[in-house]
Amino acid sequence: MTEEGFWKFLEGRGRADMVLYSTETGDPDIDAAGEFIRGHALLPEDYNNLTERELEEMGELLFREKVKQKTKEAVLILLAHQVSDTALTILTKFNMRPDKPLVYFARLALEESLMWNGNP
């Protein structure tokens, strides 16, 4: 999956209903958490019906150097909401060496994935 293909895939699936609000604080960790929360607005209506192949293709984007940070954030959000060993494995692997600007964001995604997958 290409970065452009990912966004077309995402745009074609609609959006899950939600209300979000957060503000910038100046604290990098708190602001990253706010960005993570706002990122949930990207979840498609059928976010829990992604195939293992789709998860793998999206996950590959995390490990490509030239993929934009916003794309990686969207992938992290989608993977975080999957009840899937594949998604959990990808997030665990990415958290071993995340892109520097995504360290906290990636950790939040992994923690959310652990929750969805029944691991405290």
Residue ranges and their predicted role:
Residues 1-40:
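Long, acidic/serine-threonine-rich intrinsically disordered regions with weak helical/coil propensity
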Residues 9-14, 112-120:
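Positively charged, hydrophobic/aromatic-enriched amphipathic segments
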Residues 16-20, 51-63, 84-96, 119-120:
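Amphipathic alpha-helical scaffolding segments comprising HEAT/armadillo-like alpha-solenoid repeats
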Residues 27-29, 46, 62:
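TPR-adjacent "capping" and linker segments in tetratricopeptide-repeat scaffold/adaptor proteins
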Residues 31-49, 71-83, 93, 104-116:
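Structural detector for internal amphipathic alpha-helices that build alpha-solenoid repeat scaffolds
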Residues 56-70, 76-77:
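Short N-terminal edge-element motif at the start of the domain
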Residues 67-72, 87, 101-102:
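Positions within the helices of HEAT/ARM-like alpha-solenoid repeats
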